[in-house]
Amino acid sequence: MKKLMIAVGVSVLLGACAGGMGGSSGGMSSTNPMVGGAAMYPTKDIVDNAVNSKDHTTLVAAVKAADLVGTLKSPGPFTVFAPTNAAFAALPAGTVDTLLKPENKPTLTKVLTYHVVPGRMDGPALMSAINAGGGKAVLKTASGGTLTATMSGSNVMVTDAKGGTAMVTIANVYQSNGVIHVVNKVLLPG
């Protein structure tokens, strides 16, 4: 029964991307979902795609402030759980402005790299890891912390070190150097 539920979850996760428009095949997928009103091209890297999403302007500004552009343009591969502008706006008042100050660059870098998992973990790989882990997958982040991925009904949920949980709202946005999963909350390291 558990395997059937996981199989249904994989189908829903993959099906969520089927209606999206995308660019040409980059060897990964014939289509990519639209993100923030912009086409995402599997032949472009994470940064070159993210700058076009109107839903990720805060994330892009933070990546620039933390000097992570070069890293996220490198070959990777990376899996990025990308919080939306609304996710950043839901943080306590003043948090984003404080993080973007030059003196807080180490903290900002830690928060951002906590959203990055080395390697390419698309939906099927993530679901396989959840299944292999008996319903949860512990993911080691680029910051050295861990995230826990689980299923809640047909949704993939990602839980941070503080117990906060984000839902993957758009999965499998393939990039030349990895894959992005859009999430609805900012994940915070311990």
Where are the regions a protein language model picked out?
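C-terminal motif of bacterial Sec signal peptides marking the signal peptidase cleavage site
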Residues: L13-A16
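Mature, structured domains of secreted/extracytosolic soluble proteins
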Residues: L4-I6, A18-G190
